[in-house]
């Protein structure tokens, strides 16, 4: 049986970049460029579904069109966060779920993520230019 993560009522974060605080502090230009590249990849996948499915099929050795379409619909349409902003509430819920399951998490949610680099893309006009004038919703409604 297959489930959509968002149908399970469990917190999850999608479309994010993970790095350490040293890289954020010492190489912010590299991080900013990588986040811009991630934004371009999100755009490319949405606007070029056949190319995206061909790439996924090649990497995962999937040839069945129905499986590729299903994966594309789930990840490129339903789950992808087009704005790439990490939702603070989702981080807090994820940490709380981990704590309830017995994981020791000492840090506060706000200390675990940084939306500065994504916010810079919006402030600079990068996202608006990339998406041809209209910055998309975080996720498409099913």
Segments from the language model and where they lie:
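Ligand-binding "clamshell"
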Residues: 1-6
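A bilobed periplasmic-binding-protein/Venus flytrap-type ligand-binding module shared by bacterial periplasmic
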Residues: 13-30
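Conserved C-terminal helix/tail region of periplasmic/extracytoplasmic solute-binding proteins
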Residues: 99-142
